């Protein structure tokens, strides 16, 4: 029987980069807090968590690429909030950010986690940043921990 690979939720020793869009900061700051809390509660050292703030969601893939290619991180988490308005701008931004982040996960050799909220309303964003629907920053941190540990297993 072949090997079974599975990532574990142990963050001790992991170096994690987090890219956060400043636009809608009243939401993204809560996502960041959730991600940092999730990493630390799973054993990460505060000194092993670096944060890069960018103007908005559209700039996230660039900073995430720089972090991922630096060789300093076991995983990169991307956090942002895009809330639908009355123009098609929402669709353009969401599509490009999602494509950019997913391509980094496939090309850089380290997990790049998509934690960008794309909601129809401010209320939906608030719910996903720590109220009714949990904190998607925390969930992104959990995914980053698991995927970083899974990736390390393939290097052994």
Curated annotation (Swiss-Prot):
Sample GO molecular function, one term: 6,7-dimethyl-8-ribityllumazine synthase activity
Key words, A-Z: Riboflavin biosynthesis, Transferase
UniProt keyword Transferase, yes or no: yes
EC annotation from Swiss-Prot or TrEMBL: 2.5.1.78
Positions annotated to bind 5-amino-6-(D-ribitylamino)uracil: 23, 57-59, 81-83, 114
Entry's transmembrane regions: none
Reaction equations catalysed: (2S)-2-hydroxy-3-oxobutyl phosphate + 5-amino-6-(D-ribitylamino)uracil = 6,7-dimethyl-8-(1-D-ribityl)lumazine + phosphate + 2 H2O + H(+)
Family listed: Belongs to the DMRL synthase family.
Identification of the protein by name: 6,7-dimethyl-8-ribityllumazine synthase
């Amino acid at each position: 029987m072949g090997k079974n690979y599975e990532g574990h939720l142990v963050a001790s020793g992991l170096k994690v980069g987090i890219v956060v869009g400043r636009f809608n900061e009243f939401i993204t700051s809560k996502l960041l807090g959730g991600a940092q809390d999730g990493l630390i509660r799973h054993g990460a050292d505060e000194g092993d968590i670096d944060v890069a703030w960018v103007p908005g969601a559209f700039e996230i893939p660039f900073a995430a690429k720089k972090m991922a290619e630096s060789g300093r991180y076991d995983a990169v988490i991307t956090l942002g909030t895009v809330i639908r308005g009355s123009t098609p701008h929402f669709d353009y931004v969401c599509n490009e950010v999602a494509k950019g982040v997913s391509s980094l996960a496939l090309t850089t050799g380290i997990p790049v986690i998509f934690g960008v909220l794309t909601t129809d309303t401010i209320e939906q964003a608030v719910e996903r940043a720590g109220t009714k629907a949990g904190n998607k920053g925390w969930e992104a941190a959990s995914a980053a921990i698991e995927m970083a540990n899974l990736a390390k297993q393939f290097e052994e």
